[in-house]
């Protein structure tokens, strides 16, 4: 089944909003029990790969980082796939590098080699899945899941902003 341009545009917009909300947005929205926004208001580059597994305060922290970053870029790889898994993986690498650079420039999180590796791997997984079968149903599923997660997340951010202003 052919994917309509409107669905494709909607999916790209939702994926971009999702990636930015959970990367740059972490510096502005706290999620109790998962992360504190203040801890991400930092301008730091971490170039040592996989060191994050040694520096977390909770045992599940590195696993949350690993699987969260993989999951974040699977839809990006799926949507970006056209003809080549390798080209799509390179695109995902550049997209991740852009996000990490934005985090550094905006002092909105750690610019981390692990994130670059895990995001690119997530993009590779998404591209590989799309190379096997790309369907409108999968795109609608990505959109629905992203919206279901984004709405409460952004509502939490709006509540924190209102509390800050008051």
Feature names for model-found ranges:
Residues 107-133:
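Alpha-helical transmembrane segments that form the membrane-embedded catalytic/substrate-binding core
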Residues 1-107, 128-166:
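Bulky hydrophobic segments
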């Amino acid at each position: 089944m052919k994917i309509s341009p409107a669905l494709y545009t909607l999916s790209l917009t939702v994926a971009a909003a999702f990636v930015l909300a959970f990367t740059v947005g972490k510096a502005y929205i706290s999620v109790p029990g998962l992360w504190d926004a203040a801890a991400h208001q930092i301008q730091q580059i971490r170039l040592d790969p996989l060191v994050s597994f040694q520096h977390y305060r909770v045992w599940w922290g590195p696993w949350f980082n690993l699987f969260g970053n993989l999951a974040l870029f699977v839809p990006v790889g799926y949507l970006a796939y056209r003809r080549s898994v390798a080209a799509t993986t390179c695109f995902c690498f550049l997209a991740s590098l852009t996000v990490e650079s934005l985090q550094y420039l905006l002092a909105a999180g750690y610019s981390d080699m692990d994130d670059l590796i895990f995001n690119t791997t997530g993009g590779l997984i998404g591209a590989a899945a799309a190379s096997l079968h790309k369907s409108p149903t999968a795109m609608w599923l990505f959109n629905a899941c992203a919206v279901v997660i984004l709405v409460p997340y952004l509502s939490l951010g709006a509540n924190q902003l209102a509390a800050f202003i008051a």
